[in-house]
From Swiss-Prot:
The keyword Transmembrane does not apply. It comes from Shewanella amazonensis (strain ATCC BAA-1098 / SB2B). The gene is ispD. Its EC number is 2.7.7.60. Pathway: Isoprenoid biosynthesis; isopentenyl diphosphate biosynthesis via DXP pathway; isopentenyl diphosphate from 1-deoxy-D-xylulose 5-phosphate: step 2/6. It comes from the Bacteria. Keywords: Isoprene biosynthesis, Nucleotidyltransferase, Transferase. Belongs to the IspD/TarI cytidylyltransferase family. IspD subfamily. The keyword Transferase applies. Pfam families: IspD. This is 2-C-methyl-D-erythritol 4-phosphate cytidylyltransferase. The record marks R23, K30 as: Transition state stabilizer. The record marks R161, K217 as: Positions MEP for the nucleophilic attack.
Length: 238
């Protein structure tokens, strides 16, 4: 599959925020849980809206969402809201469908619950367009010893970590191509866990861009406290 190396085109950040985050055990969707002085999603959106290279931010929310309008970021002129779907891929596709046909934009897809993203990581991912015109993702090399579990919960084997990476977000792809491959993968019934998996299914292999360890996803209650510590540390170094 041929790609023309180009760093042109607008940058559109997409935030799928229609999920409920059941593992947090909270009464509200996890993206609206308080983190320091504001909800998690507000931190995430602020990091994207304040980046000078990002032209537009599209947030996909649930039809039942009664929290989004209370965010100050919801009124930013760079932000557009769309209705998301049941799964992450459905929400990303809804956001991509809000873009004009035949646009040359790049889609920068970022988890709603990753509030510690830095501008430096965004810069590194955007710079990778010349090296990886097919797209790339932020990721981290696996540092720990990895084990594969047997069905009874015991260790089956140790997995070589040499070529393993933790996939992070943002994930950056030409918007039209990502939309095409997401539609095709969903129509084929493929399980899509992130945008890169849809591209891989289509025979497109994204680049890996090393990201920061503090770009964590708030998934469990303990993550909330850790994210707060990371945000405070980042603020002290700015």
């Amino acid at each position: 599959m041929n790609f023309q190396s180009s760093s042109s085109g607008s940058i559109v950040a997409i935030v799928p925020a229609a999920g409920i985050g059941s593992r947090m055990g909270a009464t509200i969707p996890k993206q609206y849980l308080p983190l320091l002085d504001k909800p998690i999603l507000a931190h995430t959106l602020q990091r994207l809206l304040s980046h000078p290279a990002i032209d537009k931010v599209i947030v996909a929310v649930s039809a039942e969402d009664s929290w989004f309008d209370s965010l100050a970021e919801a009124r930013d002129p760079k932000l557009t809201r769309v209705l998301g779907g049941k799964e992450r891929a459905d929400s990303v596709l809804a956001a991509l469908s809000a873009l004009p046909d035949s646009c040359d934009a790049w889609a920068l897809v970022h988890d709603a619950a990753r509030p510690c993203l830095t501008h430096g990581d965004i810069d590194a991912l955007l710079a990778s367009r010349l090296t990886y015109p097919q797209g790339a993702i932020l990721a981290m090399p696996v540092r720990d010893t990895m084990k594969r579990a047997a069905t009874d919960g015991s260790i089956e084997t140790t997995v070589c970590r040499e070529a393993l990476w933790h996939a992070l977000t943002p994930q950056l792809f030409p918007a039209e191509r990502l939309k095409q491959h997401l539609e095709q993968a969903l129509a084929a019934g493929v399980s899509i866990t992130d945008e890169a998996s849809a591209m891989e299914w289509a025979g497109v292999y994204p680049g890996l861009v090393s990201g920061r360890a503090d770009n964590i996803k708030v998934t469990h209650p303990d993550d909330l406290q850790l994210a707060g510590l990371f945000l405070q540390a980042q603020q002290q170094h700015t």
